[in-house]
Amino acid sequence: MEDPVVQAAQLAFSVRLKNSSDVSENTKNAQAIAKSWRSAVHALDPDRFQIEAMVTPELDQKIDIVDQENGCAYEFKVSGKNAPAEFYKDIVKVIIWNQKRKKKLSSLVFITEEKWGRPFLDAPMPRAYMKYLAELDLNVSVEYVRHET
């Protein structure tokens, strides 16, 4: 069964897609996609999904969505550009979340755009790191959203 949070990301990505070379326009579009995704997931079950969950106040970092029922964090990097840096940063957010709480997160689903993200994330180093984290009971996976053809 497909993950409804990932499905919502694909839908938000497809609906709001714009082709522009303007950096400001692309930033606004990415923000609109992320907001649409968070709203759609919240509508699925507002008691289950915590939106923009604070890791710790002193770090001023948030996890996009926390599935409180399954102990799963979701992060959506709309543009695949710079996805590797965001990927590692998001893993650190989950590790710190788990250090600061009794109720731990057991998984992270990192969602990003396929064209730019896959070449860097479907690679030996990220795969080795995900394998290592699984040995520490943190399951990390990468899901890709794509332009519908």
Regions found by a protein language model. Name each.
Residues 29, 33, 86, 125:
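Soluble or luminal CAZymes and related metallo-dependent hydrolases
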Residues 61:
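Beta-rich catalytic cores
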Residues 75-91, 119-122:
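Active-site-adjacent loop/helix micro-motif of nuclease/hydrolase catalytic cores
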Residues 91, 95, 127-130:
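Generic structural signal for well-ordered alpha-helices
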Residues 1-54:
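Acidic-basic catalytic patches of nuclease active cores, encompassing PD-(D/E)XK
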Residues 65-67, 71-80, 94:
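Conserved catalytic cores of phosphodiester-cleaving nucleases, focusing on short active-site segments
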Residues 3, 109-149:
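Domain-level recognition of nuclease-like catalytic cores that cleave nucleotide substrates
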Residues 96-104, 135-138:
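Arginine/glycine-rich "motif VI" loop of SF2 helicases in the C-terminal RecA-like domain
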